């Protein structure tokens, strides 16, 4: 089963748009996707369900123990061909000034790879440095790939080799 977390360095990077686009593409390919949202957010799961017709649930590490979140994930993901978990806020941003209940903690608790949504507006090499910082901030970041959002095809062709060389991550 294909399963991963969609995360970003900060809010406003396009996580929900990317998540909805991926869910629609997976559904169109007949993969029967299931969606999750980290935290108590009810708006994004409503988009997943109402607009896309994709089953969606919340996974909240602030209100639930890790084992409970793992059990909920296993229960609701069962029988689906793909699972997309949408993170909230910035990748490491959790309760207060901690990583508790962050998208990173969810990826870590579920041992899922992370697709990092990055916006290259106004940056190139600096974007590589920022991503390197996210990858190395914790011993196990789970970041497995980069998706450039709000990026022209021309800029993508220029940034892809740079980012892949500097970060050792595939750029989608």
Place the predicted regions along the sequence by residue:
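ATP-dependent carboxylate-amine ligase catalytic core
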Residues: 2-110, 118-142, 150-157
């Amino acid at each position: 089963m294909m399963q991963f977390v969609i995360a970003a360095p900060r809010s406003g990077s396009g996580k929900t748009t990317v998540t909805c686009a991926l869910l629609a593409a997976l559904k169109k390919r007949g993969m029967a996707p299931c969606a999750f949202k980290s935290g108590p957010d009810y708006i994004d799961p409503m988009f997943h369900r109402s607009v896309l017709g994709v089953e969606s649930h919340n996974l909240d590490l602030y209100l639930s123990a890790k084992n409970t979140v793992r059990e909920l994930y296993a229960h609701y993901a069962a029988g689906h061909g793909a699972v997309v978990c949408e993170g909230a806020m910035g990748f490491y941003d959790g309760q207060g000034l901690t990583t508790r209940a962050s998208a990173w903690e969810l990826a870590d608790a579920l041992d899922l790879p992370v697709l990092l949504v990055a916006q290259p507006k106004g940056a190139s090499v600096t974007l590589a440095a920022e991503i390197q910082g996210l990858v190395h901030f914790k011993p196990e970041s789970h970041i497995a790939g980069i998706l450039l959002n709000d990026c022209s095809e021309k800029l993508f062709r220029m940034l892809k080799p740079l980012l892949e060389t500097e970060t050792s991550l595939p750029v989608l």
